[in-house]
Amino acid sequence: MGIRRNDINFGIGPAGTGKTYLAVACAVEALVKERINRVLLVRPAVEAGEKLGFLPGDLTQKIDPYLRPLYDALYEMLGFEKVERLIEKNVIEVAPLAYMRGRTLNHSFIILDESQNTTSAQMKMFLTRIGLGSTAVITGDVTQIDLPKGTRSGLIQASKVLSDINDIEFTYFTAKDVVRHRLVQKIVEAYDEFDRNSVSKINNQDTSHINESDN
C-alpha cells in the first residue's frame, strides 16, 4: 500500500492479511512524526444498524466492540496507558461512521475499517469528509459483507468508480499475504476454491438448461 504517497488508500483482501494492522502502524508513524494532528478510527456498526442508542454506556463504550481490532493494534504499538491518554486528549478519536456526517477532517489520519459494510451513500459521505493535510486508509474484505440482502457495498462500488483517479490507490491482498496462523491461509484458499466451483457449477447448469431448451 502506497500510504505515504497517496492521500486516499484502499486495502482490499481476506481476513488475516494485516490490512488493519498496517493502516494503524502508518497512522501511529504519522502521529509520532507530527505529520498529522490526530488519528480517527471509524468502523460501520452493521450489527447495530448504526443505531447505537439502545446499547448501554457512552459513545466510545458503545462503538468499542466494533473497533476492537483497531484498539488491539494501537495497544500493541503504543501501550495501553498512552493510548488511553491520547484518547482523553482527543488526539485519537473513535467514532461510528454515522457520526462523520457534516464534518471536515483536516490534518488527520483517518482509518475506515470493515468498509465492505458501508453502503454506497456512506462511502461517498466518508470520502468527502477528508480535508487538507489528511490521509485516509479504507480497508475491507469483499467476501465478508454483512449488509442487508440487495444493498450494494460501498467498497465494491468505490473500487469501480475511483480506480482511475490519481492520488487514490487500491492495493489487493490475497491468501498468500495472510499473516495469522498458517491455517487461516488454508481456510481462505479453501473458501475461494469453493466459491469458484460454485460459480462454475451454476454456469454449467445454465448452459445445460439453454441446450435443453434448444432441443
Label the model's feature ranges.
Residues 2-112, 116-212:
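Conserved helicase motor core of SF1/SF2 NTP-dependent helicases
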